[in-house]
Amino acid sequence: VPIYVSAGFGFTSDPQPPAIPHDNNPVGSYRRTFELPAEWEGQRVFLHFGAVNSAMYVWVNGQKVGYSQDAKLPAEFDVTSHVRPGENTLAVEVYRWSDGSYLEDQDFWRLSGIERDVYLYAVPQVRLRDFYFKQDLSVDFSTADYEVVMDLRNHLGKEERGGAELQLLYGQEVVSSQN
């Protein structure tokens, strides 16, 4: 059992990982409606939670979307197949303790619930999800080689062709360009 602080775990004096107390595990229930813009139809829709402590189940329009646990990291769910234009209902069940609570035994207030922003966002079916830029500078910093790795996502179920252009700027001047 990891022990990070001199204080014991907040939920038991006799820890038995990964067991959590079922008779003393408060649950917070959250429910609200939201409007999905009609112009989001045909796009991927994601539900983002900035942080929820300690574990949660999520439902959209009565359908279970998923589960997440980690007190300080974001969680995202692809809710495209669960939402519709117009009014939708979001329900979240937050558990105070989870088996992850053993790893999160840090010196902080032991409060539970939704701790950061919750929002929806829409993206195209084919998109650049992320990229990584790696550079290798010469010893005198006068030249550099670089590599760009792109994470492309295609949710259409069929092959799509496209292109990307990369421009490296120095002020307003294009010093390198690649297709």
At which residue positions do the language-model features occur?
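Surface-exposed, low-complexity/disordered Ser/Thr/Gly/Pro/Asn-rich loops and linkers
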Residues: 7-22
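Predominantly extracellular/luminal regions of secreted and cell-surface proteins
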Residues: 1-6
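Short beta-strand segments of immunoglobulin-like
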Residues: 133-139
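Ser/Thr- and Asn-enriched, surface-exposed coil loops between beta-strands
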Residues: 71, 140-144
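Beta-strand-rich binding/interaction modules
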Residues: 143-179
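Accessory beta-strand-rich segments of carbohydrate-active enzymes
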Residues: 20-130, 154-156, 170-173
